Structure formats: structure tokens, C-alpha cells
């Protein structure tokens, strides 16, 4: 019998392939996205130093209401505001192997509207 492909394993393989070509520096850190069934998480990461510079997620108190897409918009706004407050204006967008659609796109658009360039 044919086995069903594991979508998360395929996504992780895609993410590893992209991460080989993409990394964040202190000048232009990486905006990383992780999407679970219940939430969405965003981090601005300096890969050279191995440090998270700013982060936001649906676990924050400001993000508790609304649909998942509305929550993604608020997370994008929060991570952009926190990054700009630390003097970060340009980032490299790492969509984490997810399609640029839905919650990932909503978060990216909100981050752009609030001052991040990518």
C-alpha cells in the first residue's frame, strides 16, 4: 500500500534547503516564522552571533483575540515594532518552508507596514 507523505517532513526538508542559502547578520538579521496548528511565532535572529534580537508570538497577551490570520497580523506588527525599537530596519525573510500564503503572508505584510524592509 502507498504511504501518505508527511507534510511536516517535506516542509522541514524544504526549510533546510533554503536555510543553506540564507542567513542573518547583525546588519541584516533573519526574520524567522514558525507556524503551528494553534499559533504563529516570529523571531528576528542574528545567525552570526546566534542571538534572538526580537520576537513575538500568539502567546503574547496583546494577541489573544481574533482568528488565526488576524493574530498573525498582530504578531507581524509586534515583531516589527520591537525590531525597529532596537534599530533594525532591514531583515531577510525566512518563511520556514511554508508557502507564502495565508497566515505567513499576513504576518509579512504587517511587518512591512510597520517598518521592516524585506
From Swiss-Prot:
Disulphide bonds in the chain: none
Annotated Gene Ontology cellular component terms: cytosolic large ribosomal subunit
Gene Ontology biological process: translation
Record keyword Ribonucleoprotein present: yes
Comp. bias regions, Basic residues: 10-20
Gene Ontology molecular function terms on file: 5S rRNA binding; structural constituent of ribosome
Superkingdom of the organism of origin: Bacteria
InterPro entries registered for this protein in UniProt: Ribosomal_uL18_bac-type, Ribosomal_uL18_bac/euk
Keywords annotated in UniProt: Ribonucleoprotein, Ribosomal protein, RNA-binding, rRNA-binding
A Pfam family reported for this protein in Swiss-Prot or TrEMBL: Ribosomal_L18p
Stretches for region Disordered: 1-24
SUPFAM superfamilies found in the cross-reference section: Translational machinery components
Family as reported in the entry's similarity comment: Belongs to the universal ribosomal protein uL18 family.
Subunit structure: Part of the 50S ribosomal subunit; part of the 5S rRNA/L5/L18/L25 subcomplex. Contacts the 5S and 23S rRNAs.
Function: This is one of the proteins that bind and probably mediate the attachment of the 5S RNA into the large ribosomal subunit, where it forms part of the central protuberance.
Protein name: Large ribosomal subunit protein uL18
Lineage per the UniProt record: Bacteria, Bacillati, Bacillota, Bacilli, Lactobacillales
